[in-house]
């Protein structure tokens, strides 16, 4: 209650920009990571697609997760999950582990971003005019992604690709600190909704289907499509 309403809006906007920096792996530094860990370019592309896959499968369940947890809990879960994924990515060398971490990081990225945008929606447009709201979200997504690319370019130029992961971890830790000290522990944006009835098996199967399709189209040319036993 002691946080001024105007400051609350800008804090949520800042949180949205922060979530655009996240992802356990960034395709902008693919050259460095391919050279250091001896991976294929397709391995890094696949990790980028897995991040998008994680964002996609979050959509059907993010409303239930939002109303299942308090707002502060949602931000903690998203930020801590991203921190763990980024920390593990710096040490693993197996492509399938990198893909899994990228997929999970994408899921948490979308969950945290949704937590930000759904909270300040009425601040942007009290009349719920989505013609006003979506351009603001578009600015956040595109602006955050653009700034992420610039930051990655400078950090990898003066250091190596792990600096970007450390930078993301630092941002998420600052985010957790602000959330801990400036948000109510028991605030929820709507009525409580349990996770009973959520088809988690279907979520897993759709995730496997998406990852399989992305793998086939990413590695198809490398393995010579249908003439390869690996594709079959």
Language-model region placement:
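MFS-fold secondary transporters
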Residues: 35, 85-90, 105, 179
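Extracellular/periplasmic helix-loop-helix junction of adjacent transmembrane segments
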Residues: 29-58
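Helix-breaking motifs and short loop linkers at transmembrane-helix boundaries and internal kinks
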Residues: 38, 70, 88-97, 108, ...
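Cytosolic juxtamembrane N-terminal segment immediately preceding the first transmembrane helix
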Residues: 1-24, 28, 35
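Conserved MFS/SLC helix-loop-helix module at the cytosolic interface between two early adjacent transmembrane helices
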Residues: 57-96
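Hydrophobic transmembrane-helix bundles of small-molecule transporters
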Residues: 159-232
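Cytoplasmic helix-loop-helix junction between adjacent transmembrane helices
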Residues: 105-137
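Central cavity-lining transmembrane alpha-helices of secondary-active solute carriers
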Residues: 48-64, 110-117
């Amino acid at each position: 209650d002691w946080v001024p309403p105007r400051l609350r809006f800008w804090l949520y906007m800042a949180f949205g920009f922060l979530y655009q920096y996240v992802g356990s792996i960034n395709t902008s530094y693919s050259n460095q990571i391919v050279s250091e860990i001896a991976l294929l370019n397709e391995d890094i592309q696949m990790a980028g697609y897995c991040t998008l896959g994680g964002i996609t499968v979050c959509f059907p369940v993010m409303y239930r997760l939002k109303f299942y947890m308090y707002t502060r809990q949602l931000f903690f879960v998203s930020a801590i999950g991203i921190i763990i994924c980024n920390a593990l990515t710096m040490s693993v060398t197996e492509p399938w582990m990198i893909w899994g971490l990228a997929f999970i990081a994408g899921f948490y990225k979308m969950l945290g971003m949704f937590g930000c945008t759904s909270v300040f929606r009425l601040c942007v447009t009290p009349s719920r005019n989505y013609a006003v709201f979506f351009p603001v979200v578009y600015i956040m997504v595109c602006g955050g992604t653009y700034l992420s690319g610039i930051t990655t370019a400078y950090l990898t130029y003066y250091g190596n690709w792990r600096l970007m992961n450390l930078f993301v971890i630092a941002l998420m830790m600052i985010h957790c600190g602000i959330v801990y000290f400036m948000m109510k522990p028991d605030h929820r944006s709507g009525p409580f909704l349990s996770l009973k009835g959520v088809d988690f098996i279907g979520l897993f199967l759709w995730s496997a289907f998406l990852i399989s399709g992305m793998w086939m189209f990413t590695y198809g040319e490398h393995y010579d499509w249908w003439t390869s036993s690996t594709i079959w």
